[in-house]
């Protein structure tokens, strides 16, 4: 686990700029793949995605009766796992830009008490200040147009002392991670074309290639106002789990 101190000042210019794709383009793309999203996630991750998701939920440190926000919630699995931790007395909200993905989540988990899903923009979350104990985002940060603003909105939505967590695909460093990068670059587009969604999975590859290093993401989180920022590489560094704390106000 790698950490940066709370008073760390990143060197050099820093914009926190994110994905260049427009919100409309991203929304339409995810609407189109909503029905295939979960299966494709399993294939693309070589069946590792459920394990990574468990690590994210564990790190949130939620207790029964707690509350959580899941940003870029997709088909709702992370939010559902968070709800299983807080129980019927707790509250979990999933927010996603795509109406198609949100509809899948709403249908799938409509009978779960304390669990809800809304269409919303991560750049302007439909939440009150300090509303939740924790906020998560899994494989969604690289789709945002401004990473710093995304983290800042998550931090705004979490109470002082609460956690903000980000699970995302990382740049390759280990041999295993380099193999997985080859998998993403060469095999994932083929899987997408076979599934009839070639452009969408070509976008996936480009967004992974453009995503900053784990060290840079940690700096951006600190710039967004989070403290005790740290990150852990999972499965040989294929993905990284970033964690930060909302400071006491």
State each model region's role:
Residues 46-64, 81:
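Conserved alpha-helix/loop element of class I SAM-dependent methyltransferases that forms part
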Residues 67-124:
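Class I SAM-dependent methyltransferase SAM/SAH-binding core
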Residues 87, 144-145, 158-159:
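Helix-to-beta-strand junctions that scaffold the AdoMet/dcAdoMet cofactor pocket
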Residues 123-135:
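A short acidic, Gly/Pro-enriched loop at the edge of an enzyme's catalytic core
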Residues 133-147:
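A short SAM/SAH-binding and catalytic strip from SAM-dependent methyltransferases
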Residues 148-163:
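A short glycine-rich, Lys/Arg-flanked "PGG" loop and its adjoining helix->strand segment in the class I
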Residues 167, 171-220, 224, 230:
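C-terminal alpha-helical "lid/dimerization" subdomain adjacent to the S-adenosyl-L-methionine
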Residues 227, 233-249:
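Core SAM-dependent methyltransferase catalytic element
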